[in-house]
C-alpha cells in the first residue's frame, strides 16, 4: 500500500510540474540522466523542431521567425530560444556563446526560395527550410536515408566540457511528409 501511495504521489507530482504526463519523452539510452523528464514543448504554429540533451530538461526551441506582417524574416528565418524546464519553465534567449558556438544556426537563402540551415556547432548535418504544398514552412533533414520533416533532436552527453562535450550519440526524429510515420535515426557525430 505504501509503495502504491509513493507511486501515485510521484505520478501526480510529474503531472503538476509538467502538465499532461503523455507529453514527455523518456531519456533515450536510459543510463546516466535516466531520471530526467524531457517535456514536449507546447504546440505552436511557428514550431519547426526542438533539441533536448543531457544533463537536464532545458530545451532549445527552433521556431519560424515571422515579421510583424506575418511573413518570413528572410534575414533570420529561424529564431532560437530556451525553455528552461529545469528552472521554472521560462523562455530565455540564448546568450552570445550559446548562439555563436553551440546551439545557433546559420541560414543561407537558396535560389528556389528554400534555405540551407546549419548548426554552428555541427555543419555536417544539413537542414533545409522549405514551404510545402500546404503553405507551411518545415525543416527537412535526411534521416535514415529519407528526406523527412525534422521534429526533435536528442543529444546524449557524458562528461567533457562546454567547449568539447563528450557526445555519445545524437538521436533525430522526424515524420515522413507523405505518410506521417515517425522516422528515427541515431548516430555518433
Task: Locate the predicted segments by residue.
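Bacterial Sec-dependent N-terminal signal peptides
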Residues: 1-25
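Short, solvent-exposed mixed-charge patches
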Residues: 20, 188-189
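N-terminal export/targeting and maturation segments
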Residues: 20-94, 182
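Structural signature of eukaryotic scaffold interfaces centered on beta-propeller domains
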Residues: 39-42, 107-110, 163
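Mature extracytoplasmic domains of secretory-pathway proteins
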Residues: 82-150
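Short linear motifs in intrinsically disordered
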Residues: 107, 128-129, 156-164
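Short, solvent-exposed, Trp/other aromatic-anchored flexible loops in extracytoplasmic proteins
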Residues: 149-157
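Short, exposed beta-strand-loop hairpins at the edges of beta-sheets
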Residues: 160-185
Amino acid at each position: 500500500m505504501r509503495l502504491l501511495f509513493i507511486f501515485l504521489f510521484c505520478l501526480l507530482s510529474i503531472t503538476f510540474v509538467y502538465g499532461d504526463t503523455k507529453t514527455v519523452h523518456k531519456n533515450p539510452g536510459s543510463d546516466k540522466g535516466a531520471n530526467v523528464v524531457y517535456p514536449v514543448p507546447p504546440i505552436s504554429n511557428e514550431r519547426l523542431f526542438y533539441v533536448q540533451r543531457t544533463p537536464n530538461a532545458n530545451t532549445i526551441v527552433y521556431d519560424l521567425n515571422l515579421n510583424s506582417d506575418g511573413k518570413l524574416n528572410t534575414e533570420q528565418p529561424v529564431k532560437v530560444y530556451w525553455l528552461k524546464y529545469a528552472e521554472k519553465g521560462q523562455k530565455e534567449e540564448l546568450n552570445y556563446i550559446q548562439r555563436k558556438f553551440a546551439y545557433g544556426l546559420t541560414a543561407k537563402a537558396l535560389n528556389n526560395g528554400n534555405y540551407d540551415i546549419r548548426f554552428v556547432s555541427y555543419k555536417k548535418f544539413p537542414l533545409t527550410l522549405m514551404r510545402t504544398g500546404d503553405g507551411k514552412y518545415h525543416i527537412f533533414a535526411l534521416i535514415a536515408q529519407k528526406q523527412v520533416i525534422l521534429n526533435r533532436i536528442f543529444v546524449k552527453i557524458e562528461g567533457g566540457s562546454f567547449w568539447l562535450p563528450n557526445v555519445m550519440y545524437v538521436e533525430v526524429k522526424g515524420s515522413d511528409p507523405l505518410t506521417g510515420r515517425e522516422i528515427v535515426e541515431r548516430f555518433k557525430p
